[in-house]
Curated annotation (Swiss-Prot):
Pathway the protein contributes to: Photosynthesis; photorespiration; 3-phospho-D-glycerate from glycine: step 3/4
Name of the protein this chain belongs to: Glycerate dehydrogenase HPR, peroxisomal
Gene name of the encoded protein: HPR
UniProt keyword list: Glycolate pathway, NAD, Oxidoreductase, Peroxisome, Photorespiration, Pyruvate
Activity regulation, free text: Slightly inhibited by oxalate.
Length: 386
């Protein structure tokens, strides 16, 4: 490997060898693997993304499964190496898997796991946090105070945006987008406009019911509208949060032309995937529109930011921490481990990967199933009837 690596080993005489390319939060995931006869090896290589060659070295001559990260390039080379080592499964410790060549995994008969159903609320909470921080200019104000610049109250000091009664726009009303929308509607009495290829009836019913509640109590009811296009959301919303999947159709979804459609004092939040925004165009837009604000958790070419982004006062940037709550990260580690364990032991696939609470109950043994295998149909794997 390029740098010295320390390998932490649990249950060295275990029957099955499972490798984790990074230390993961909590210990439950380790205990679950060890209790089922696994030798667990954890790679400690801080502040470095493992290369393909590094991971091949970790896989070695015999490896039953690997738990990896979204930052790793899992393509044909790695799946070939894992297959030769007798491996049956790889799982991302992430809900996304755009770092994985699933077709290559299919070719070598390797199951690919992910961790949905555990990070919905925590990701939505960070999107809401970025929304508030941008609206009320919290980061700027914090720097102002720490710099010793505060000399007393002034009527124009860090004037920001009031969210109540404004319109929140959501692009991608899946689990996370809908959770975020509910937080902003119920928490701040914002009206909703959303765009999604599929109608979110459940979200619409929620906003309708909350609007009726407000009206019954003598307050202005909130409203909702399903937009016919993304451009409609961009033009009408005061605050816009992006929650699409990343594919060829959503790459640079927000570009120079679409940024120009937004209100001059709008707020844009992205906790989905970095490449859905043309980051270079965003930097120019921020420079040209000082009242426009953005909150970013993800970036086009992580871990780097486009030149100029770090210098803009109207941008809040955080290092891909949307899922970084203790319960969530430990849950993600557990699901990733159980994905690998399930395939190693020959268990079926859980029938609903979006309902994973039975795997996260620390007071009970998890079901004998892999929580979420994205290529289970392609591999012809059986589904649990539990």
């Amino acid at each position: 490997m390029a740098k010295p690596v320390s390998i932490e080993v649990y249950n060295p005489n275990g029957k099955y060898r499972v490798v984790s390319t990074k230390p993961m939060p909590g210990t439950r995931w380790i205990n679950l693997l060890v209790d089922q006869g696994c030798r667990v090896e954890i790679c400690h290589l801080k502040k470095t993304i493992l290369s393909v060659e590094d991971i091949i070295d970790l896989i070695g001559d015999k490896c039953d499964g690997v738990i990896g990260q979204l930052t790793e390039d899992w393509g044909e080379t790695l799946f070939s190496a894992l297959s030769k080592a007798g491996g049956k499964a790889f799982s991302n410790m992430a809900v996304g898997y755009n770092n994985v060549d699933v077709e290559a995994a299919n070719k070598y008969g390797i199951a690919v796991g992910n961790t949905p159903g555990v990070l919905t609320e925590t990701t939505a909470e960070l999107a809401a946090s970025l929304s508030l921080a941008a609206a009320r200019r919290i980061v700027e104000a914090d720097e102002f105070m720490r710099g010793g610049l505060y000399e007393g109250w002034l009527p124009h000091l860090f004037v920001g945006n009031l969210l109540k009664g404004q319109t929140v726009g959501v692009i991608g009303a899946g689990r996370i987008g809908s959770a975020y929308a509910r937080m902003m509607v119920e928490g701040f009495k914002m009206n909703l406009i959303y765009f999604d290829l599929y109608q979110s009836t459940r979200l619409e019913k929620f906003v309708t019911a909350y609007g009726q509640f407000l009206k019954a109590n003598g307050e202005q009811p909130v409203t909702w509208k399903r937009a016919s296009s993304m451009e409609e959301v961009l033009r009408e919303a005061d605050l816009i949060s992006l929650h699409p999947v990343l594919d060829k159709t959503t790459y640079h979804l927000v570009n120079k032309e679409r940024l120009a459609m937004m209100k001059k004092e709008a707020i844009l939040v992205n906790c989905s995937r970095g490449p859905v925004i043309d980051e270079a165009a965003l930097v120019e837009h921020l420079k040209e529109n000082p009242m426009f604000r953005v909150g970013l958790d993800v970036f086009e070419e992580e871990p780097f930011m486009k030149p100029g982004l770090a210098d803009t006062k109207n941008a809040i940037v955080v290092p891909h921490i949307a899922s970084a709550s203790k319960w969530t990260r430990e849950g993600m580690a557990t699901l990733a481990a159980l994905n690998v364990l399930g395939r190693v032991k020959g268990y079926p696939i859980w029938h609903d990967p979006n309902r994973v609470d039975p795997f996260l109950n620390e007071n009970a043994s998890p079901p004998n199933a892999s929580p979420s295998i994205v290529n289970s149909k392609a591999l012809g794997l059986p589904v649990s009837k539990l």
